[in-house]
Amino acid sequence: MSQVPVASPASWSSVASAAAAAVSAATSASSSLAASVDEPAATTATAATASYADERNPLIALFDGLLRVVLASLNLIRILATFSTITVPSLVYAILHYSLTLQLNFPSLALLFLTSLISAFIWLRYRHLNKYERLREVPITRDEGFNLNPDVASPGGDNDRGSFHNYLDDFLQAIRIFGFLEKPVFHELARHLQTRRLVAGDSLSLDTDFSFYIVIDGHVQVYAPLPSATASAVGQDSVEDEDDSGYQLLNEVESGGTLSSLFTILSLFTEDVKLSFDDHDDPHLAPPHPAYPAMDRLNNSSAANHLGRGNNATAPTSPYSSAFNPPSQTAAQLQLNAAALRNVPAAISTEGAVERLGGSAAVRSTSKSSHARTASSGTASATVQDGDTSTIMDPLEQNDDGVTSSLYHAPDLQMPPAQAAAPFSHFAPSYHPSPAGTPISSLPGSTHSPYFRGRATSIHALHEAAGGPNTPGSILSAMSSSAHGHYHPQADYLPRQGAGTVARATVDTTLAVIPAEAFKRLTKKFPNAAAHIVQVILARLSRVTFHTAHKYLGLTKEVMRTEKSINDLACFPLPSEFYEKGGMDKLRHRFLPQPNSKRETTVDDDYFRDFQEWTSISQRSSTPVPGSKDDTKDAATSSPPKVRIASDLPSLTTSSKQSNQKPTSSRISAARTPWGHPDPPLKTPTARNMVGPGDLLSMASLSQDGWYTTGFDMHSAQPTPRAKPRSVSKLEPFHGPLPHPVDDSTDGTSPLSGASPIPIRKGSSTMYHQGEAIGTDRPFANIGLPHFDIKNEVMDCIAKSIGLAQAAHSPLAPSYQASPHINAQDSLLQRSVFKSAFGSLSMLDAAMAEEESSITGTNSSMAGHGHSGFHPSDFENEVEIKFFPAGSTLVKAGESRAGLFYVIDGFLDVLLPAEANELEEEDRLKPNMNHKSAKTDASSGSSRQNRPGSHRKDSSSASLRAGLLDERNLREADVSLPQRRGTEADRISSNGDGNSGSVHRPAMREGSSSSTSYGTPAGLRKKPTESAKVGNALDGTGGAGSSSRRKPSHVSSGSGATTMPRHPDATNSNMAFTAKQPVLHPSLHQQQPLRGKPSQQSSQRSKDGKRSIFTVGRGGIAGYLSSLLGTASYVDITAKTDVYVGFLPAHALERIMERRPIVLLTLCKRLLSLLPPLILHIDSSLDWQQVNAGQVIYREDDPSDSFFIVINGRLRAITEKTNGIEVHNEYGQGDSVGELDVITNSRRRTTLHAIRDSELAKMPSTLFNAISVRHPAITIQISRIIARRVRTELVRSKQEGAALGAPIPGLPDLGRNNLNLKTVAIVPVTRQVPVIDFAAKLQTAFDDTIGGRAIFLDQSSVMGVLGRHAFSRMGKLKLAGWLADLEQKYRLVVYVVDTPVSSAWSQTSIRQADCVLMVGFGDEPAMGEYERLLMSVKTTARKELVLLHPERSVPPGSTREWLKNRPWVHAHHHVEMPGLTGSHAGAAISTGGDPKAVKALRNLKQKLETSLQRYRKTMTPLSASGRPHHASDFARLARRLCGMSIGLVLGGGGARGCAHLGVIRALEERGIPIDMVGGTSIGSLVGGLYAREAEMVSTFGRAKRFAGRMASLWRFASDLTYPVVSYTTGHEFNRGVFKAIQETHIEDMWIPFFCNTTNITWSRMEVHTSGYAWRYIRGSMTLAGLIPPLVDEGNMLVDGGYVDNLPVTVMLAMGARSVFAVDVGSIDDTSPRAYGDTLSGWWVLLNRWNPWSDASKIPSIPDIQGRLTYVSSVKTLEEAKKVKGCFYMRMPVEEFGTLAFGRFDMIYEKGYKAAVELLDGWDAEGKLPSGTEREDFEDDWEDGDEYEEYEVYTDDESGVGGGVRKIRKKRRRTRRKAGISARRNSI
């Protein structure tokens, strides 16, 4: 075991000594900095000793180390104590005792101070004063390429066919032409669907049957025969492929197209409809047998064809009458004749066509016997008397070959053709042939019974006696069905080109066929559906064919010839006894002025006061009243019942003996009158001095129902069914005594009984006094007509003329449910049944009730089954008897809803407007031409004017006016009252009495408890025209009557009248025979026209270029086509002589047509038979296309095979580029597209797509070529259209080429394409937006500013009209048709989206809109739910943003937040809406979020405004609080939507621009609103200041402060720099602009603003509409050399005046209609210079001091450079002066320098005075736009009329602001009242 050794004491001592040595060594080492190198041995020894000691004892080493550490610490403490107590105090002491001496002189101190000041200035300059440099936001760009690209909106939306396409799709597409079809109806057609295969080259005669052909697969060409005259020419020198075929290519039909003309379908539906109805259709009166059978006439030799022409004694046969040459033609031959007529080329006269039909001696013989003609060898004209024809052809009219046709030549104008119905039997024709020149009446068998009304021998009675012409059928079928073998082959009479249209398949083609039997079965099984199809076809005819022929092809004359033929066919004058017994004289006496007007009226007053006295005087010179004992006995013994049903009364109640008695004056030779009227010489009434106004108020039946007295409740809105009348119809002839049906249901007094006077109606006034009781109820009793009611007689004649009186097939079993049932809800529409393709689809609502479905309604008059006679008990007689002096204009071309004018006596001229006028008007009105059809019947039922009383001394110049307006008419008329200016007839014959005053008289009788008190308009009082002063040439009177015009309340124009406000208690009351008159202010009658008289101007225009198409005489009807088709009038209708007419308003005619489709069927029958072949060919080739929103119609570089006419909807033409798309133009209603490409045979230049669902008329180029061959005049018409289109594009390209070359997308079309907007949708951003209140204020603005020609629709209004199923799948087609109808009636249709996002109305509104207005709060830029809906719909319509603000201020940059997230917004508008609570700003104001101090200031402001308001009333014409209506933001928006904005463009000129402030002040004082502002240079600054808040005070202050800064020489000097780029740095200039504009963005400005600059980097002009305003205003003011160019995104911008100093074209491109352009530029010295070929500068310098030298005129280098820079600007300035709508204002401030800002006040005052003078001058001329003028001034009136608006006003109580302003103010007030009424009845 090992043991541990223990150290001895000696060893411990050694260890300790070693440790001590180690510590001492360590201490010495720490004290010394380094060991000595000389002692290595000692160190080694010490270390060895230490290690030895450590090795010896570790404890000793430890203690030794500790000891050394303690010692080292003590040493350190000693050192620190020494440093702190000795070293530091010594150092401090040394520093404190140190001294330094610095010596500086004053220059050194000044330099030091300046250095410090400059350093501080630089620090502030670049740190704080250049804050504007950091405002560099990039302008907002709009991604229009994405937004407007149709491929994005509707991929595959064009006609590309998918792989799953089949023939059923084509079939469904083709039958859309029939409108909406219910499922059983569709199945009925589909059940008969067949297919037919055509091999390439096969031909198909489209006239062989009436089947409906649809091309399913393949390609078919349609040909029409060439005219014989042109066929040879084409054969000799042909440009077509079909050189010698004799046919012309009309159309090329591809898959999905139709081959058949819709007229073939119409012919099936009208087989049993007669062309006209006469008394001889009744079985009681069998017509005489014809002299020749029809077949025998067709079998005669062709040599007799020229018999008519060879006969010098008779004029040629009327073509239309010859075409239907009964009396006993067979149906087959009638079909042949009609079909051949339809296929006769237009180049051949219609007479020649008849010759080709079958020219036999019998034809001519019968023709001669059927048409009495008078001849005169000494004259070049002949009177054409086709029995009862009511037309006189123009003697100078030529046929299509250019050769004057003998058809249009007649002898001297001796009498109207309708005088066959006059009481002169020697003018009456007969059935029997007579020798030439022999009076027909002298022949045996001629009928003279007055009951026959002279119509017994009319040509239409001839062929109607045989049942009327049947449907135009197939030529082949007619040949096969000819009876008795008397028919010669048609080839003997018709060349090959007359066979009709032929279809030829170019490739193997498959056709889908709906056979004719299917439509026949449809007619019998579903008559209501068939009626609907007829309506749709008529709609297509009117809206496509007639529209194209009239508006585009210039074939108005051809269309109106059809109306002339209809007048020839259906002429029904009044009974002859009315004329021969003095009825006409009594009627004329009715319009004489009242001689005893001072007498107070009583309840016994009647129209025929002192009638016996007049009768005694009249009978002295008139024929004694014919009568007999039977007459007396009949009148004395007959006791009519207490209630007389009108249908039970014959038209003329005379005995049979009386009927057979010839008038004693019938043998007297006709007396010549100046206008050819053969009036009997003994029937001239007493002479009169004037013709006064008035109305034939109540000639007989003054009952509450208008026609008869029953228990009908006038409070009912719709007529109730009457009791079933007797089988003896009113139109049925009567032999024997007058029947008196017994009616015990009432104890009232019949108006015909004469037992008691008519009760007085409250609220009405009369113009006549009642006479004795004997004449009260029988106005014609004293002249032998005791039961004659002229209103009923006129209505009977109108009913027969329009086909309403179709006789029943069986007189023993008349049907009384002859038309589809129309419920009350459908009748509320009060609209035409044919205006739209889907109009009056009553079966849609009825489909919800089985008993009203078109499937179950089997009794329909349209099918020809159960035709009942005309029963007036079914309708309310609304005929108005009116008088028009010679020269009056009843209807002007372009007017809608004119109504029917039945001529009682006199002549009406149907005039074709002058071609030059049309072209000029089209050029002038092209942007706004599609609203002309927006007219209503507001004035057609207007109140009639009373006969002038004794209160006016100038009654000699009383107007000859008469009109009616009852409350029911008001209720219907108010639907569209604001948008209609009324027909010419209404302006002449209604509401006004020339210069005469008016007096209220007691009512005639008591009506319903709430009779209307509607006052008639107080119109302009004009001097009588020359024609009116002549008086009635018929009776020799010299009554002076004014033919002044009148416009309804919303139109203030030439002779317009301002309608008085409706009485609040006015309700339903039939005022058919009540006259009304307003109380007019005396000052009205003292107003003198500013320009010429409209009637004289109209007469002058008529002399200048209007051509007469035909004349309408007695028994004729004017306005037939336009009224029944619901289109605007194609012609002017004027009074050729003093004329008395029966006027049937449009709304009354609409109700008749809704209940009796037979009227439309009769029209269809007549159109089938009488339309010229040219029109039929056009109709067969025109394609009616319905395209969906976004659908591409054609693309760029496609072949040009057709062009399009927009019927409804909107199209956009674009071209695609690398950086997006370029919008070229937008086309609205009435515009044509693509004809330039077709005519030039070039490829499409643009891509055309539909913005929304649209209707188009497509005209193929082949049709155009064919028409050009047949009608060369069309080529000229199209050439003019092309030339105008090219000229317009060239002018626009010149104007916009330099001005609109801006890189900002969307600026060129920012407002150019809003001029013809038709539909606008108001869509809220979120549901919290008060869109209803917004729409109400906007509608008020429309009414107050532009006349309210807009209708606002919301869901409730639409459902109220169309029912709760309006938005269902079934009702969509009906809704589309109704909306399209509204577009034609109104200038603007506004859809208000007031429903949830998911509703159908929201989507419908967006899809139907041309422009979408997104309405949101200005301080809430978040995306709303409706915006997401808008994006999902993918509409390509323009989208504009409306930001609502509670006050007129916009926080800077807030608008940018809206726009940067919505690149699809095209424009934005700031609108002030006081009381707005939905936004954050409005909530902050209303909830008290402001501090107490702000609240106190607001309260003080309100108190001050309230206290100052009483003083302001005497200073301003505005009585309402807030801004003027015309200056409000809503009015600005309304003008924007209608394209009537007023712009202000301010030019550049340095300090001379201070005159701009004076111009703005003058405009504000005159009340002219400023809707947009633009400027250049100093004009951009002044314009920007005004646009910021639209307030003059702040603008003036800020502009004056800027001028003060610029006038400071110190500031200018402080900004000088070394002139490398410019003389100044531009900082002071920038600072001055920024201080004036602040941080406002251009998009934040309240009024739309722009400024232009010149980009010298790219050498172009730029227009700025977004970004910081100060930057671009400064850039626009950058004068090169004085200020450095502004750098914007790398481009250098200088003064915009270098390119365009007055950017008028930019303002027009933004949508302004009128522009005030203010020029303050300097005028350069243009005097000649002469200084030789060389020039020494030294010589110039020396001679500048020589006063006799011309050296001062030598320009310097800066002058030469300045003139060079403004070369382009001078050219654009001259062009701007010539721009239409530009009011150029040159300010006389040339003497002031460019930098003369110190003369601010002088320049300002000079500009103000100059502006006032200019405005006064324009105001005196009537050219000054005010923002409140009616839009249809320019659209519908001539230059002489538009300025007379200033004379239309009512009394003004304020008495301030006289002259024009006073009148305007009152005009606005009156218009507002009318607008309120219209808004109340907007639907």
UniProtKB/Swiss-Prot annotation:
Biased composition (Low complexity): 372-383
Lumenal-facing ranges: 97-103
Keyword Manganese: no
GO molecular function: lysophospholipase activity
Segments carrying motif GXSXG: 1575-1579
Swiss-Prot/TrEMBL keywords: Endoplasmic reticulum, Hydrolase, Lipid degradation, Lipid metabolism, Membrane, Repeat, Transmembrane, Transmembrane helix
Location of the protein in the cell: Endoplasmic reticulum membrane
E.C. code: 3.1.1.5
Bias type Basic residues, positions: 1861-1874
Residues annotated as binding a nucleoside 3',5'-cyclic phosphate 1: 863-1158
Classification via InterPro entries: Acyl_Trfase/lysoPLipase (IPR016035), cNMP-bd_dom (IPR000595), cNMP-bd_dom_sf (IPR018490), LysoPLipase_patatin_CS (IPR001423), NTE (IPR050301), NTE1_P-loop_dom (IPR056556), PNPLA_dom (IPR002641), RmlC-like_jellyroll (IPR014710)
Residue ranges annotated as motif GXGXXG: 1548-1553
Regulation: Inhibited by organophosphorus esters.
Protein name per UniProt: Lysophospholipase NTE1
Organism: Mycosarcoma maydis (Corn smut fungus)
